[in-house]
Amino acid sequence: VKIRASQINGCGFCTDMHIKDAAHAGETAQRLHLVAAWREATVFTEAERAALEVAEQGTRIADAAGGVTDEAWANAAEHFDEDQLVALISLLAVINAYNRISVINRSPPARSTSCTPGFTAR
């Protein structure tokens, strides 16, 4: 969710950081490379796909009249309980805010190929 929202928002700093964090946590390179193409990729679970759909629609509010569609919410509710949906919404709101701060501040992606997991400031 953080990677996809950061990609949509054009935040190189956050995209770079969250990909490095995910790789450090054991995520595969293939899945990381396919986040932007999740609709066509077969490497994501149905729950992950539902979360990515909510992330896209919630990030592209200006592009989608009414925000997240009823269909996307219903699909997400099949995979996540109420607390998990609240966590998803909260995560999405926070990453969108951080993306905007980083883009406005013109924070460049890290120059290093490694990062300290959890590092969030320049």
Regions found by a protein language model. Name each.
Residues K2-R122:
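Hydrophobic alpha-helical segments
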